Amino acid sequence: MNISGNDNKRIEYTVRVLLCIAVVLVGRLFFLQIIDKSDLQAKNLSQVQVDRKLQSPRGTIYDRNGRPLAMSVVTKSLYADPKMIKQSPSEVAELIAPYVTMSKADIVKSLQEDTAFVWIDRMMEPEKSKAVAQLIEDKNVEGLNFVEESKRYYPNGNLAAQVLGFVGTDDKGLDGLEMVLDDELKGGIQKELVATDRKGNAIFGSVLSKYLPDKGKSVTLTIDASIQFIAERALDKAMEDTGAKHASVIVMDPKTGEILAMANRPTYDPNHYSQGSEEDFKNIAVTNLYEPGSTFKPIIASAALASGKWKLDQVYNDKGSFAANGHVMQNWNGEGYGPVRLIDILKFSINTGMAEIGTTTGADILSKYVRNYGFGSKTGIELPGEGDGILYNPDDMSKLDVATMSIGQGIAVTPLQMVRAFGAIANGGSMMKPHIVKSYSNIKGEVTSTTDPEVVGQPIPEETAKTIADILEKEVSEGGGTKAMVEGYHFGGKTGTAQKLDTKNGGYLAGRYIASFIGFGPVEDPKFVVLVAIDDSKKGSIYGSQIAAPVFKNIVSQLVRYYQMSPSVKDGATVAAVPAAKLPAVKSNGDGSVVLPDFRGYTFGEVRDWLHTAGLYFKPDGTGKAISQEQLPGTVVSPGTPIVVQFSH
């Protein structure tokens, strides 16, 4: 076949065009793959990368027996990339609003932002995050996704709420120990730079940078969750019986200063702290200033005895009134008691007798002893908001001021200061520093530091302390504190009823009182000091002897069983500890869970029958009578939970 010159020219032209196109394509491909690759990657990632800062878990707070009081759990948080949302913001808001805390209007506003990352809801409840995840899948919603975050969880609800405090969304402690120990408990920050696909899901292997530090240290408290539960349950009953505005209880070991329980009412659940009020958050056992009233009389009496200004057998002829600086002080019943000694003055809380003792001792000596007891200064406990208290300047005190202070008026103290002072009386005059942190542990669970018991003073000699303790035992067994008496045990204590201070206008609030009782025991070998304060009772009596002393009895009658103390009888012999007639009836909560009682002292059959009735699995260890249990009294357990109880003959 012959090819003409024109045909050759056309073929040559076509080849040249194809070669040019090939060169252009190869050149462009080379530019894209080699020269412009890094620039394109940067542009692409700048559109879809997400810079996330996630908090690693806080350390756990345990009670003295290793029971968790505050812990961190993994939850899911919902975020959005508004640039990837295909549906209208209002449509997306309509879908997810029922399951998130953000309102529809705020969701719409967030989804209209010119950004690649906005939070929609942090630390969601599991059922709600599952519901949203299902909606995302069913409705093919793009641009919504979850990230795991650590959330603070309080497994016992409101137990020790004011002591523990709470943590904000950004893992910052906002109250209580969570705030004070924030640096110790807080973990580090996890930072991730993540590339995502068009649906907002992280692309596998696209984490550009990641730093995952260790979680925070753990803290063990001196608090005993079982004793805390006993105290709070007693307070709940007291609030119901009295209709009081506030109430508080402190339980302390006088030999170590360890706080075993600290409870307040009203209260709140730190899992839902946003539902609480400022009143609910107050740890009034530490922060509240009040006039101690008659509970202060043993402090004055001990100062008079220790200084030698008053003798134990010294007689005062009480005529029912005491005059000072033109004012007349009377007894609570307006009557005189005739010839009385110190034991009678304290036992029957005789105001006139205390005024005589105080003024005989003098302002300087009394003030010195009162300050040696720690009044007027903080205890230094590891809790926020502690008050100093208010005392007279001895140089400015009149005879009336001395008489007034001698009956616990004209000064202001905190409940914790009173517990510290009575701890000294119970502990042979040796005063311990109250503390609530027992130890710190690292992430491996190794104890790194402990809080050792610390003697902070000896305000009175041991002999004086024993004398006052014996007198206070008579106050409970024979005097005004008989409603605090627990049959078979020797407890010492003092009742108090004081008018409330008017902090705005000065003076006192008419008809408003703080009723209190503070005691310790057993007197022979004190294991605990217990203070009960009831603020502004609205129902029934206003007197500490009538409404605070029974709360003390309620608490210590359970404590002697918890400590397995054998009662003492008057002839000095002892009898074996026995439980109540029968275990409390099983009471199920709405979800079928039950609160475990204290099984100690009950027979194998009694414990078995109770657990079977409660729908729980009985795992006995031994036979005879119960001596201990793995799950502590007060633990809330679900149906079918194995309950381990140890028995012995």
Regions found by a protein language model. Give the residues of each.
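BRCT (BRCA1 C-terminal) domain core and associated BRCT-interaction motifs
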Residues: 618-638
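Generic structural detector for well-ordered beta-strands
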Residues: 220-222, 317, 459, 595, ...
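Conserved "repeat-terminator" motif of extracellular CCP/Sushi domains
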Residues: 585, 637-649
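Soluble non-cytosolic domains of exported or imported proteins
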Residues: 56, 86-90, 122-126, 171-175, ...
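Beta-lactam-recognizing serine transpeptidase/beta-lactamase-like catalytic domain environment
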Residues: 2, 70, 197-208, 249, ...
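Short, solvent-exposed beta-strand edge segments and adjacent coil->beta transition regions
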Residues: 75-77, 115-119, 214-218, 285-287, ...
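Conserved SxxK-family serine transpeptidase/carboxypeptidase catalytic domain
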Residues: 17, 121-127, 131-133, 147-162, ...
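Periplasmic/cell-envelope proteins involved in peptidoglycan metabolism and beta-lactam response
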Residues: 1-273, 364-376, 484-487, 504-506, ...
